Amino acid sequence: MHQIYSCSDENIEVFTTVIPSKVSSSSRRRVKSSHHLLAKNVVIESDLYPPPRPLELLPQRCERRDTGDRRWLQTGRLQTARPPGAHPTKTPSRPVGISEPKTSNLCGNRAYGKSLIPPVARISVKAPAGAEVAAKGSEHGAVLGRGSRHLKKIAEEYPALPQGAEASLPLTGSTSCGVPGILRKMWTRHKKKSEYVGATNSAFEAD
């Protein structure tokens, strides 16, 4: 039952339309039948496509994959165990054991050739350097000779000085000009000790 209201400025009109019960019952039946059909369709589809069983099927698939991997590994091992002459396409054209020493020999010859060139240059350069070293050695020898003479003089003047002090005393003045820095440091240490020893000795000397 439907009611339609039409409003105007002067009057209000109401129109009513009555729907018989037979029509409503037929429409309800159609709706119910459609619901039943949908339910049947759902049941049929569920029967056709059963739900998967993941927990039961997964181990079987893993086992199949494991067996496939094992077969592949076995075939790989068989291929590697075969002699190299069986597969000429897979083996390299030249053997590795022969090609490696050739390259090493070539590298060794190059390195040997390079190492031969610098020594010749060094020998030619070292000749004047050796003369300079000999000249320096002679100068040092002269300085040491002067130092030994100075030592003798000091030993005559101060007979009570110890041997370490005597060795450190001549390294003063002009004798330490051509001496390396490390020796100078050592001599200065001995010099300080000798000065202290000389002071103690001079205190006991008679005037």
Swiss-Prot record:
Record InterPro entries: Vexin, Vexin_dom
Annotated segments matching region Disordered: 65-104
Entry GO terms, CC: nucleus; plasma membrane
Protein name: Vexin
Gene this chain is encoded by: Vxn
Top-level taxonomic group: Eukaryota
One Pfam family this sequence matches: Vexin
Subcellular location as annotated: Cell membrane; Nucleus
Keyword Cytoplasm: no
Keyword check for Cell membrane: yes
Job description of the protein: Required for neurogenesis in the neural plate and retina. Strongly cooperates with neural bHLH factors to promote neurogenesis.
Family assignment from sequence similarity: Belongs to the vexin family.
Keywords, ordered alphabetically: Cell membrane, Membrane, Neurogenesis, Nucleus
One GO-annotated biological process of the protein: neurogenesis
